[in-house]
Amino acid sequence: MTPGRTGLVAVALLGLWFAPAHAETIYVTIENLVFTPTEVTAKVGDTIVWDNKDFVTHTATATNNDWNVVISPKQASKLELRKAGTFDYFCRFHPNMKARLVVTQ
């Protein structure tokens, strides 16, 4: 292999080594006034999709007010995770609906 090609192969392999991980989409179902699953672990950059199967509007609202997602009846809403931490959340309209989102780097 010539020196030019060796360098090109090394750069290509280095790019594969440092390529960012593929972001995941994680689904949470809302049905009968319950978030399922009640605890989700995800990574920064992942997307959470709340799929509301109920006939009423819900929210997914972080208890620390970092985010608030409104989910219309029979619709889905999403949130891209931008910050690591443990986030307890609830529905503003139905405060007994509670869940936890653990976001890692």
Model-flagged regions — what are they?
Residues T2-G4, L13, F18-Q105:
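Extracytoplasmic copper-binding redox domains, predominantly the cupredoxin/blue-copper superfamily
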